[in-house]
Amino acid sequence: MAGHSKWANIKHKKAKEDRKRGKLFSKLSKMITVAAREGGGDPEMNPDLRLAIQKAKDNNMPNDNIERAIKRGTGELEGVKYEKFVYEGYGPGGVALYLELMSDNRNRTAAEIRHVLSKNGGNLGESGCVSWMFKRRGQLIVDLNESDFDEDELMLEALEAGAEDVVTEDNLLTIYTDPSDFEEVRKQLEEQGIKFSSADIAMVPENNVNVDDKSTAKKVLKLMDALEDHDDVQEVYSNFDIPDEIMEEITEE
């Protein structure tokens, strides 16, 4: 399906497990610290910080942790200086990979990411090699199993609030917005009582690469997990689409 991220749905199902691991809090702290360092510690004046704080709150990160992360960014508390950068490359089956990273040692991170990729059938590419395959969009996900609203109601409310597109797959309804409309659309929908299981500005694939070979699909998922598990990787985006029947077979193994 064009313009939809299968990985976003898979990640949603893994989110509770991620929270237990505690790795998510570390990544969220880093995101807040870098946003505060680059744009100041006032979320009203810093949209990147506002988004990072909201994401932390969505994942039940304690306010004390959030405040400490902001102060590390503004210099009120001592902290590691992180650099923000992007890597692009390819995974098994030729799927595109777009990685957003934060690290205090870019050379170390580059070597480690290269190792993860080569070990799992992927490789780094030149800057710009896959970024044109993605579009930055607001992405709000509603779990229809947990929502008080049905699919038609949600679609109508979303479009009236200014959403660009609404897609339903695997009982997850994804609302896409222009990045500049993201906060306003979210605010309007929350005022209607709609709850989101995740809300973020993401790199969404313009078109998908169909991975209909089970062996390749397993390799893609293994690589995505390995990249997500790396401490310096903040976000992993990909354009793969694994058919439901193959996903079910893999899940049952």
Curated annotation (Swiss-Prot):
Region listing for Disordered, in residue ranges: 1-21
GO molecular function: DNA binding
Keyword tags: Cytoplasm, DNA-binding, Transcription, Transcription regulation
GO cellular component: cytosol
Gene3D superfamilies: 1.10.10.200, 3.30.70.980
Places the protein is found: Cytoplasm
InterPro entries: Integrase-like_N (IPR017856), TACO1_YebC-like_2nd/3rd_dom (IPR048300), TACO1_YebC_N (IPR049083), Transcrip_reg_TACO1-like (IPR002876), Transcrip_reg_TACO1-like_dom3 (IPR026564), YebC-like (IPR029072)
Family: Belongs to the TACO1 family.
Protein name: Probable transcriptional regulatory protein Hore_12350
Organism: Halothermothrix orenii (strain H 168 / OCM 544 / DSM 9562)
